[in-house]
Amino acid sequence: MERPLCSHLCSCLAVLALLSPLSLAQYDSWPHYPEYFQQPAPEYHQPQAPANVAKIQLRLAGQKRKHSEGRVEVYYDGQWGTVCDDDFSIHAAHVVCRELGYVEAKSWTASSSYGKGEGPIWLDNLHCTGNEATLAACTSNGWGVTDCKHTEDVGVVCSDKRIPGFKFDNSLINQIENLNIQVEDIRIRAILSTYRKRTPVTEGYVEVKEGKTWKQICDKHWTAKNSRVICGMFGFPGERTYNAKVYKMFASRRKQRYWPFSMDCTGTEAHISSCKLGPQVSLDPMKNVTCENGLPAVVSCVPGQVFSPDGPSRFRKAYKPEQPLVRLRGGAYIGEGRVEVLKNGEWGTVCDDKWDLVSASVVCRELGFGSAKEAVTGSRLGQGIGPIHLNEIQCTGNEKSIIDCKFNTESQGCNHEEDAGVRCNTPAMGLQKKLRLNGGRNPYEGRVEVLVERNGSLVWGMVCGQNWGIVEAMVVCRQLGLGFASNAFQETWYWHGDVNSNKVVMSGVKCSGTELSLAHCRHDGEDVACPQGGVQYGAGVACSETAPDLVLNAEMVQQTTYLEDRPMFMLQCAMEENCLSASAAQTNPTTGYRRLLRFSSQIHNNGQSDFRPKNGRHAWIWHDCHRHYHSMEVFTHYDLLNLNGTKVAEGHKASFCLEDTECEGDIQKNYECANFGDQGITMGCWDMYRHDIDCQWVDITDVPPGDYLFQVVINPNFEVAESDYSNNIMKCRSRYDGHRIWMYNCHIGGSFSEETEKKFGHFSGLLNNQLSPQ
């Protein structure tokens, strides 16, 4: 860039779910690799604990943000207690997680990060190798021998993946009151032909997996609250009644395999691992008593609007939030993002103090999704802008909206580094199976191949790379569960895909960016046309779990705007780079001048990765006037519009150099324009285009006095992927009297409600991209 010289019973045992092929269509974990990359899980052989080791039970409790994490609690000698963090290690965490049925531990936490427990501290100075069958087999000071307090209670974060074939040890079930449910996996199995043909599956038997066997749950103690929890896990906001007579008739024809326990949920749980194990069920086949003469439990779930069958296309082709009070921003997937709430006409964020699964589930259900998979903290889904409306939210789980929960309106001590987010359970649509990447160096990149029907058969083929861009790539990465797109490729000759998939089967793809799948984008259908050919010009993508997010400082634009009448003889460099209006060519070069609307722009990267230019160094352009390279031809548009949305003047900045001008806190600068330096904007840093550098203006010499709208758009052509494009527009009202100009009500697009926007006198966006004749 050009620069001037200068409660313990309700706590849960974490569980679920490495999915078997049968249940994969019912419940999608996050994140996940495409099926073609997944390897079959090895058969699990649960180690046996030595005979002289005490029998214990474990659970994960406390203020959890995922069902697979929490404070470690141990049931021993008739009492639940905790574990001290002294000498605790990742090896001990592995033992805890595997004893609970998870593949491994991701990390562990000290100093009661999930809240202080109650009861005895059973284990202190715990030493494990990581191979023990039970935590009781690790060495320690002895049971209850400790000098710790509950401020030192240890917690663990387990992998979401379950051990295949894992079977929970229920040997202490008769000794422990209100034991949490432990199953390897759970699914909704469609029984009636009507529902077997539907996607997603919304009704059927509730089945749990024990070892390698799927079993039904007896409905003798089944309640609507249980159904609500199950529906929430599978991505549905609520449950409904069903035709019991049909299922009774169906059950009488088949022999059932029942799980020997019942469930006891309150209806507010985000996951069944938070529900209690209900009474045992009599299953004595010798006495002709099966499920106490009951039937298999059935659930019928209500899909949210996004996933409801709707018209001939069956599903809405693009997702647009319609909830007026809550929205999600910055997520890679539908049902994921930073939580923003509308208050007094302005959108603001939520502080993550006390943010948990219960509160996150209220948000998810409010937006038409299921319960929450994760309550995201620490602005891990990007930082928001504007006010922080809510803090210390505490929901019971029964609320219809997050604004019905108890909360603190004071946000002292909070900043946007603590913005809360959610990852919601969404219905499994099976869309991932209709797309794959081939030939890449890793599962996050490759040639795009789609599964289509041709002449009654399903065939894999390529997508034409003509006019393929980052927006289309974003849809592909989302559909595959691989996050955001980092690059879109129109040529993939260097990636050798499946030779049986070398035929182009999809062309003319044009996406808005919000579609659930590539098939929902506009395309040519069966009339495929790819003039450049197939194998060489097949579309490709590279995906990434994170993305940048650029936001302009609207206040700075408003504060730094002014007019300058600049002589033509001082604008020679600007003339060479076409930074002036067309009429400048007729202006006398010695006595003439141009009236320039000047301002400073400060562009922040609030995302989770660095913003890098689309082109590599080999494609950068040297600008002799400025003595450095420009890496992006189009990075920002500056436009002056009349009140009906027609452009009357525009900035003509030819190209841009990107660098870190300043950074937050102790973040290091990584990019600079000088000395052919690497270019970009580091996350947590900003690039400053000062008002006094060349071409940082709009030439308004030919604009008459009047009321106007000033608009700045960052990354207008979507050349670089971002986690949120909705905040790339800044709008201001302006008044020009022929001598002075005023800027007011400058703000980022989407910061206010539609009603408030109307009060500002703004329109939805640029209506005509051509300059109107003067």
Curated annotation (Swiss-Prot):
Glycans are attached at residues 288, 455, 644. Keywords: Basement membrane, Calcium, Chromatin regulator, Chromosome, Copper, Disulfide bond, Endoplasmic reticulum, Extracellular matrix, Glycoprotein, LTQ, Metal-binding, Nucleus, Oxidoreductase, Repeat, Repressor, Secreted, Signal, TPQ, Transcription, Transcription regulation. The keyword Translocase does not apply. Its EC number is 1.4.3.13. It is found in: Secreted, Extracellular space, Extracellular matrix, Basement membrane; Nucleus; Chromosome; Endoplasmic reticulum. It comes from the Eukaryota. One of its GO terms (biological process) is negative regulation of stem cell population maintenance. It catalyses: L-lysyl-[protein] + O2 + H2O = (S)-2-amino-6-oxohexanoyl-[protein] + H2O2 + NH4(+). Residues 548-751 are annotated as: Lysyl-oxidase like. Ca(2+) binds at residues 549-550, 722, 724, 727-728. The keyword Transcription applies. One of its GO terms (cellular component) is basement membrane. The modification 2',4',5'-topaquinone is found at residue 689. There is a cross-link at residues 653-689 (Lysine tyrosylquinone (Lys-Tyr)). Its cofactor is Cu cation; lysine tyrosylquinone residue. The lysine tyrosylquinone cross-link (LTQ) is generated by condensation of the epsilon-amino group of a lysine with a topaquinone produced by oxidation of tyrosine. Residues 58-159, 188-302, 326-425, 435-544 form the SRCR domain. Mediates the post-translational oxidative deamination of lysine residues on target proteins leading to the formation of deaminated lysine (allysine). Acts as a transcription corepressor and specifically mediates deamination of trimethylated 'Lys-4' of histone H3 (H3K4me3), a specific tag for epigenetic transcriptional activation. Shows no activity against histone H3 when it is trimethylated on 'Lys-9' (H3K9me3) or 'Lys-27' (H3K27me3) or when 'Lys-4' is monomethylated (H3K4me1) or dimethylated (H3K4me2). Component of some chromatin repressor complex. Interacts with SNAI1. Interacts with TAF10. Interacts with HSPA5. Interacts with EFEMP2. The fourth SRCR domain plays an important role in optimizing the catalytic activity of the lysyl-oxidase like (LOX) catalytic domain. Belongs to the lysyl oxidase family. This is Lysyl oxidase homolog 2.
